[in-house]
Amino acid sequence: MFAERLLAVLSGRRPVHWMLGHTIGEAYEQLVQLAPRTPLRTRGALPVVRNCGGFHPRPGVVEAFASIAAGEQVRAMAFRLEQGADLRWRCAAVELGGDPVGATRARA
């Protein structure tokens, strides 16, 4: 699942260059900016893709989302996949939700 590939990079388990052949356009630069901060790395439980879904606005394009869970914390991740002339799907954009919600939010 593509969301798991993104999670591996954004949690620091894989280097950003692992996505070179799986991105197009600005998506790789977005990952280069995000990855060093490891925004999906957590202490304790490893983050996992809890659910994933998508919408097909037109053939060859998927606007996808995933919820990433680590213990009681949940983060949102959105990404756009585009199918190339070679029929391979590549990531064209990545976006992360705001602050983690869950246990830390419950204390507020």
Predicted regions and their residues:
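Surface-exposed, charged secondary-structure patches
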Residues: 40-75
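Core segments of small alpha/beta cavity-forming domains
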Residues: 1-41
